[in-house]
Amino acid sequence: MSLEDSLRSLSLDYLNLLINGQAFSDVVFSVEGRLVHAHRCILAARSLFFRKFFCGPDPPSGLDPSGNRVNSSTRSGVIPVNSVGYEVFLLMLQFLYSGQVSIVPQKHEPRPNCGDRGCWHTHCTSAVDLALDTLSAARYFGVEQLALLTQKQLASMVEKASIEDVMKVLLASRKQDMHQLWTTCSHLVAKSGLPPEVLAKHLPIDIIAKIEELRMKSSLSRRSLIPHHHHNPHHHHDHLTAAADLEDQKIRRMRRALDSSDVELVKLMVMGEGLNLDEALALPYAVESCSREVVKALLELGAADVNFPAGPTGKTPLHIAAEMVSPDMVAVLLDHHADPNVRTVDGVTPLDILRTLTSDFLFKGAVPGLTHIEPNKLRLCLELVQSAALVMSREEGNNNNNANNNNTGSSATNMYPHNHMNEEHHSHHNNNSNMDSRLVYLNLGANTQMSTSRLDSGDDDHNSNQREAMNPSMYHHHHSHDY
């Protein structure tokens, strides 16, 4: 067992203590009328706040914002927690026990600040509020690692969030001195084009002044890139503004076309108007918001890079599909040569995302935000990405051997050969020491029917045979259920 597997196993063992509730528990919290059993030694070891609370001569009163001290008799019984909500408190405990957390509300779950019943809650107001509440709790209880993780989550959210939510995060980032998040949000607000009188309804005057200063600097910077004509000093500024507005209009038209499955219009925009699909983030948008058929048609245009890193985090479309736990999207991206080993700015691969979701899902009783995941889809996504990664790894090894033997004339092999993939799949499942295989087949499949779906009834037989070769056992009932 590798060091990574050992650490993952240790993390899951500790998290299991939290899930089992009363097992070896020596402290009970009451949060919003619900009891949460925990363990003093773990909380004290992981949080300075809890260490002082349990062991200090003068414990903090932070669990009760009314300021009432918790006496010894109360600390030996049920401890009321009024400073945070149940969901946020449980997310924080999960991180304290395991070092991992997923700050995402349940998919399609009715949320207080989200009226869309089909929302994935990836960047809506409800998702932003949950992340902000988690960040506040992490800072309050002194869990700095969780605070940093939540800041990264918020930085990813605000790229697609509404401008109102961006301003909400902007205020929180200033209040808690989060400079990187402040920079991201302030630039987004500056680029929004909202006039100061509108910003004044949401932001204090000093922040509006900083936003206007950013706009001025940005305008001067862009103007300096173009030669000046002294007879008309305002000409270039107006030209740049018009060009930016034109690009925004193109992107909005492109998204409307994708929403209506009109890929032909997108093609005309690429050929006739010079639309850059990568800069417009067409593929990430289609993966997250459109159907598999639209994504496939967009890829077949040949104008979008399937491995293009988007946003400040550098996520590729395959990263997004992995986060969505969508085997349809994962399959079509891999069919068009998406790289399963590509990393984000933080060094995370699509396989890492699926591994984390797998370990989190196994303990969904302690993770309110992950109960929506369908085990069959998660298992299939993990299997597809693992198989593709194994094939690429072997191909790279073969290419290196050929290069060492000066056999440069050999032709490149297909990325997903039928027999080759089948061999990799069976070799992978015969390795009993592999942590991912144990998680997928012993746990994810333990409480669910082995009923999976066909990925693309309209695709050609070649692609279907490729995926069947990855895992023949998964498709023995493939006509009985559709995703």
Swiss-Prot record:
ANK repeats lie at residues 249-278, 279-308, 313-342, 346-380. Pathway: Protein modification; protein ubiquitination. Residues 398-414 have a biased composition (Low complexity). One of its GO terms (cellular component) is cytoplasm. InterPro entries: Ankyrin_rpt, Ankyrin_rpt-contain_sf, BTB/POZ_dom, NPR5/6, NPR_central_dom, SKP1/BTB/POZ_sf. It is found in: Nucleus; Cytoplasm; Cell membrane. GO terms for molecular function: transcription cis-regulatory region binding; zinc ion binding. Pfam families: Ank_2, BTB, DUF3420. GO terms for biological process: flower development; induced systemic resistance, jasmonic acid mediated signaling pathway; leaf development; nodulation; regulation of DNA-templated transcription; stipule development. Keywords: ANK repeat, Cell membrane, Cytoplasm, Membrane, Metal-binding, Nodulation, Nucleus, Repeat, Ubl conjugation pathway, Zinc, Zinc-finger. Residues 395-435, 450-483 are annotated as: Disordered. Gene3D superfamilies: Ankyrin repeat-containing domain, Potassium Channel Kv1.1, Chain A. Residues 456-465 have a biased composition (Basic and acidic residues). Residues 25-105 form the BTB domain. Disruption phenotype: Altered morphology of stipules. Altered morphology of flowers. Production of abnormal nodules that develop roots from the apical part of the nodule. Altered abscission of senescing leaflets and of petals in developing fruits, even after complete pod senescence. May act as a substrate-specific adapter of an E3 ubiquitin-protein ligase complex (CUL3-RBX1-BTB) which mediates the ubiquitination and subsequent proteasomal degradation of target proteins. Transcriptional co-regulator involved in the promotion of leaf and floral meristem fate and determinacy. Promotes normal stipule growth and development. Required for the abscission of senescent organs, probably by regulating the cell wall disorganization in abscission zones (AZs, e.g. pulvini at the base of leaves). Fruit abscission does not occur in Lotus japonicus. Belongs to the plant 'ANKYRIN-BTB/POZ' family. 'NOOT-BOP-COCH-like' (NBCL) subfamily. This is BTB/POZ domain and ankyrin repeat-containing protein COCH. It comes from Pisum sativum (Garden pea).
